[in-house]
Amino acid sequence: AEFTRLEYIEATETEGITALPGAIALLSHLNKAGIPWAIVTSGSMPVARARHKIAGLPAPEVFVTAERVKRGKPEPDAYLLGAQLLGLAPQECVVVEDAPAGVLSGLAAGCHVIAVNAPADTPRLNEVDLVLHSLEQITVTKQPNGDVIIQ
């Protein structure tokens, strides 16, 4: 009962929840370009859906929440499931994370990882593909052969 109450509070207390700068434009571009993407979160479905709606993010093809995996971040399970549901191998996926547990999870899953505003003391931060301060620094293009280039 206590968890349900806390979950309700988290799902309804959405003041201050906003999309990261550049997130809406980036995700909209992915949709237009036909590039599959997922939201993979440690939050429960009610909390994740409420925050997703408040942030005004486009709808993902795949939504992985805490209920869908046995082990949460920093274990790789959530990102492995996200890749599977997208029909991709983990090494074909790019994880964009701001939390240390998420960075570790993405690396453990074998995905490429972009850390955005991750704390400087994030373990294994030196192993990620890119460290950025804003999603506005990312450009994504889909090549005629289907390859996706991230710069």
Predicted regions and their residues:
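Metal-dependent phosphoesterase signature
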Residues: 1-25, 33
